[in-house]
Amino acid sequence: MSNVEPNGTVVSARDLTRIYGEGDTAVQALHDVSLDVTGGKLTAVMGPSGSGKSTLMHLLAGLDRPTSGAISIAGQPIADLNDTQLTKLRREHIGFVFQFFNLLPMLTAEENVLLPLTIAGEKPDEQWFAALLEKTGLTDRRKHRPSELSGGQQQRVAIARALVSKPTVVFADEPTGNLDSRTSGEILELMRDSVDSFGQTTVMVTHDARAAAIADRILFLDDGEIVRDLPRSDAKTVIAAMEEIGT
Amino acid sequence: MTKLALRALWGRKLRTVLTALAIVLGVATVSGTYVLTDSISSAFDTIFSSIYRGTDAAITGRSAVSKSSTTNLPPFDQSLLGRVRRLPDVAAAIGGVADSSTNLIGSNGKVISFGGAPHLGFSVDPSQPQFNSLSLVTGSWPKSGQVVIDHTTAGKKKIKVGDTIRIEAQGTAIPFRVSGLVKFGTSGLDIGGATLAGFDLATAQKLFRKEGKLDQIRIERKAGVSEAALLAQVRSVLPPQTQVRSGVSQASTDASDTKSFTSFLQDFLLAFGGIALFVGSFVIANSLSITIAQRTREFATLRTIGASRRQILRSVLIESTVMGVLASVVGLFLGLGLAKGLFQLFDSLGFTLPNSGLLLEGRTVVVALVVGILVTVIASLRPALRATRVPPIAAVREGSTLPPGRFARYRAYGSGTLAALGFAALAFGLFGSGLSTTGILVFMGLGALLIFFGVALFSSHLVIPLATVLGAPGAAIGGAAGVLARENAQRNPQRTGSTAAALMIGLALVTLVAMLAQGIRSSFFGAVDQLLTSNYAVTAENNFDPIPVASADPARSVPGVTAVVGVRAGDARIFDATHSVTAIDPGGSKVVKLTWIAGSQSVFETLGATGAFVDKDFAKSNHLQVGSPIPAIVPSGTKQVFTVKGIFKPPPGGSPFGPVTISSATFDRLYTQPQDLFVFINTVGGVTDANTKALDRALAGFPNAKVQTISQFKKNQAAGLDSVLNILYVLLALSVIVSLFGIVNTLVLTVFERTRELGMLRAVGMTRRQVRRMIRYESVITALIGAVIGIALGIVLAVLLIARVDFIVLAWPIGSLVLFALVAVAAGLLAAILPARRAARLNVLEALQYE
């Protein structure tokens, strides 16, 4: 469904400001942030707690609305979309990977993966689906329920679910935040692989330097502003950059 | 999405079952009611159609008072039978007499009686078997001085063919030899506790005091004769005050009384099914609200992966529909069991009903399913709408809760307004002028419904203060567990409030019933205390059947008896309406003290042949004064004009007298088979053991005539009220049980929700015992909140109703109210068993990691 050319801009944000609360208790979580997410690349958003990285992702994904500023996804401005139009946008263009997996406990792995298509009333492309299960290593686990899977396996199911509809962009919110380090490595590998093999545009929010190190581009947020913008870097460089920001 | 909904239900089996149970019970009541009443109707149909087996036409007496009257029809002269038999189109005809108070006397000297069912006596004519609806089980048909009785009674009382049994009908008890045992028809129909006694015609006539008279002639036509022709021919020989009907129409006429009884019973029971469903809808709405709040993240996740609001709504509604279908099907079949239980309930409480097997009609299935599913779906609408308002961003926020509803902040005003509107509608129904009966009922029903809704919604605002007070004892004796329990009850007032509201409805109704019953009882007791100055009263063993006038005669010759005064009753047509006419023996002034508006106590002794005294309302509506004439027609067709001699004002609790009371001598002249409702007796020295014994001895020949002191009489007369009260309690208990499931459900869901917190409490040193206690106390607090609001509301409703109804006074059933509160505590403890066990069993480590 990816209808955006590789290396084109798939998500763009202009002058995003987000203020929570009003009056004396108002908190400015994001301040005049602008950015373009390039298609077919993995973009990581890094930053310490409270830096505004989650807020940025929520805004980019249309989960929250900015106090001011504009966002467009796949060339479509989302500011004036109503709930139904936003739903349609999510179906066609957005996939999500969550820190706590957010699988439906009563569905099998396979059913969880297919859920976005089921909801949209679409038939899965059998070949693509088989390839996806193969890639995520779930072929043997397709009939298992989330409670019968390890944390890593559950996150694989979640990734497959995000990819199944070939969305324009996948947003991953701390995908390794709830996993041990070995499993984290496997999951990061899988995410990198999905970008390389399928050209899946991905935006990942993380505070894990190792995770950021797999990205094609790393944005650093601090106090609601983008303070650094690195190309692909190794973990050491990322850690150094973090320390430089001086949290 | 459908599959998802089904999986969601299946994945939460315990919650689903607990939620569905609330509907199961309501539906079971509805289907049980239909099964019960259909079965009773069909049993009665069978009885009446077999009574008129082989009968093409039936002649009966006809009341001059009311054409539709089917009971106490005047008997007619036996000579008619001969004339009918000589008619050319008549193939055969038999005459018979019957009596509905033919008491079999058991070996203990008491009337054999099963739960208020009638004691039927009748003549049998085995020579014309085509008319005979009885069949012999053993022995032979009765000759003079013999009796056949039904084999069910014989079995229960161990009576065998050849035994001697005393029978009391319209005279003293007389011994009969049991010549045979019979059953009704040929099937295994249970006639519902009625006792049957059959005699040959002459014996029956003598026993029933109908010598030379008949109650009925049954006719078989000759082959080839049309029914219409037969009826026309019979009509040509009918004397006045008799009528002829075809066998079929006679059967349906006889059945009409029971038909109206079963349809009343049906409406009555359906009302309780409705109440249980109403309470069930609260439980469903509440359980679903909690479940949906707990599934916030799930719904949000669905939204992020592309589910629309409409799909979320549909998914939740599919869940509730499926639950409604399952619950209704289970309820439908449970209703069959319940119908059986109701038969036994009525039996044990003194209302034995006939039964020819349970009957499940198509209508029962349709109504039960439709009602059950509709109630479930409607109750789930609000929670389902709230689920659609879950924002997608809740998927990434930890501990996300449901946003409050758009109208949440108007809730207090809205619910207050609703309740106020309800009270207004109720008050208008009660006190508004010019309303029809239907109008009154509609306004009262609507009012009650609005009040319950309003109070239920408002109850969340009462939770905090009430829990503070009601939780105080627990906090004082339960230590930390008690304090936490109280705070837990208060932390989601809406949840606690709506859980308590379900119990509130049941308890409000129970309280209302108890208040009304107490009011009726004390107004009746007040009336007896005010009116009766006699020492003793005599009534039938069952307290309400009339007794033969002769029953009291032996008391007159007991030494020390100063007055024996019978009160009789019958119907008469007066001023174009049917009224009850009562009559009193001479000496009335010694046993009854009336409040006279015109006239005085001496009226009792000066009624003479045509004098009458009337009550205030009758005098007012017919503009009567002392000296006014009252033209009356009695059932036999005789006309008589009475003259008003006095006007009295009855107390709120009523009096033994109808609107018009005449002398017993005149009554006995106008009415065939006069019978006494009560006989009042005065003795020298008042109530003493010696007097009681002497009276008992004197009336020994009439076992059905029961001598009671006035205080026993009061209690016995109120006994019927107690039976009704018990039935109401049992039926209302259903809705209390439904609300009990509501409490269980809320607690189970709460325990789920607080898993991590419970783990924390255990980790910092709370024992399992303390956890259990905490849950138990919370449950009791919730139940008590429901009880306090419910009892208060019940009292308010009762006070309103009593203010409107003249014959009920305000009286406080303190004992019952305390008992209801205790029942609520017990209910709370019961409801907490399962949730407390689950909470105590939590593994500390797992609970801490639970997410």
Predicted regions located by residue number:
Chain B
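Interfacial "coupling" helices/loops that link adjacent transmembrane helices in transporter permeases
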Residues: 8-15, 273, 280-324, 383, ...
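Alpha-helical transmembrane segments
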Residues: 27-58, 266, 289, 338-347, ...
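Small-residue transmembrane helix packing/gating motifs
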Residues: 51, 136, 141, 184-223, ...
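Short beta-strand boundary microenvironments
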Residues: 115-156, 553-558, 562-563, 567-629, ...
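Small-residue-rich transmembrane alpha-helices
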Residues: 288, 322-352, 364-389, 418-433, ...
